[in-house]
Amino acid sequence: MGKKAVHFGGGNIGRGFVGEFLHESGYEVVFVDVMDSVIDALQKASSYTVTEISGEGEHKKVIENYRAINSKHNLDDVIKEISTADVVTCAVGPNILKFIAPPIAKGIDIRTQPKPLAVIACENAIGATDTLHGFIKDNTDESRRDSLPSRAQFANSAIDRIVPTQDPNSGLDVKIEKFYEWVVEKTPFGDVGHPDIKAIHWVDNLEPYIERKLFTVNTGHATAAYFGYNAGKPTIHDALKDERIRSQVNAVLAETSALIVEKHHIPAEEQHDYVQKIITRISNPYLEDVVQRVGRAPLRKLSRKERFIGPAAQLAERGQQVDALMGAVEEALKFQNVPDDEESFELHKILKELSAADATTKLTDLEPDHPLYPRVLEKVTKVQSETK
């Protein structure tokens, strides 16, 4: 019997990143989603194409050997697949983890496989697998919780690959950048050993990789998006052609680099080279990366452990400079009432209806006595005065 992976999330990251490498590693991939259109399309097609984009051109890969299940209508089938799978992965968004936990918990509970299930959440969030693990424990009978480690092992991961705006007529095919990084902690697998998945870089300590990625790639990308959007630039490439915006991105990443170098003992020269590589990647004209796509979901991106407040809070606690990060926060606060982005409308409502203090607390979860709080409050007050 061959290897099997169940993947929650039939979107672009699921098909064009996780699914691609599971397929290349010899797994049959079972996609699980609640979107009828995605599942119907996957069930009808025997393959789809992933197109990797780089400065050298395009490279196409055909993905086959997969199935798809609609968890909205066939949840029992999903549970059965999990019970006999080798790996479960997900790319659904951090807010959806609590909804996929119950079927995973049930699938784990009825497992009879000798080897524990490997569970890896592939989300843009720190400790996403730990979060999912907590929800799974909550959905496991108390009498069975102590034996959960014998049936499943949970490893956090950091993923990095840009998926630009897709052609609306592309169907299941995915256009994606050639560069990727998928780092997963190996310690949770112990003597059993980690699953054999191509592309994964297995490490003992994941935190430096997660924070370096989140506070460089995601912070830089979002900074370019918000400054670009407010300056009327259509794409990230166009935004970074503007010297004013490029210098703002560099200033923000100089601040986050100071944190990464000091906290994780990464050599300054290595971090500098990493930053330059990231700026080159996100400014790739072939990606046609639209600023609205990169800036979407501003409430999540302004939250406590995310790409702006996360590093800024740590820097403020260390007494270090956060001027450029606060400039990026101001631009993010202006990302309001953007078509097809529900959170941007909610942001407008919060800034319009709440006091500056209440809005600051709601958006960032910072306590008033935190050293970063007054800096954010100042930006919220300023944007509120400009918001109509």
From Swiss-Prot:
Name the Gene Ontology molecular function terms of this record: mannitol-1-phosphate 5-dehydrogenase activity
List the catalytic residues.
K213
What does the record list as GO biological process? Answer: mannitol catabolic process
Entry keyword NAD:
yes
- Keywords in alphabetical order, please: NAD, Oxidoreductase
- Has the keyword Disulfide bond been applied to this entry? no
- Residues that bind NAD(+), according to the entry? A5, V6, H7, F8, G9, G10, G11, N12, I13, G14, R15, G16
The catalytic activity of this protein is classed by the Enzyme Commission as 1.1.1.17
Q: From the UniProt record, list the reaction(s) this protein catalyses.
A: D-mannitol 1-phosphate + NAD(+) = beta-D-fructose 6-phosphate + NADH + H(+)
Which superkingdom? Eukaryota
Taken from the UniProt entry, a GO cellular component term is: cytosol
Q: What class of enzyme is it?
A: oxidoreductase
Q: What does this protein do?
A: Catalyzes the NAD(H)-dependent interconversion of D-fructose 6-phosphate and D-mannitol 1-phosphate in the mannitol metabolic pathway.
By sequence similarity, the record places it as follows: Belongs to the mannitol dehydrogenase family.
Instruction: Tell me how this protein assembles.
Output: Monomer.
This chain belongs to which protein, by name?
A: Mannitol-1-phosphate 5-dehydrogenase
Q: What organism is the protein native to?
A: Paracoccidioides brasiliensis
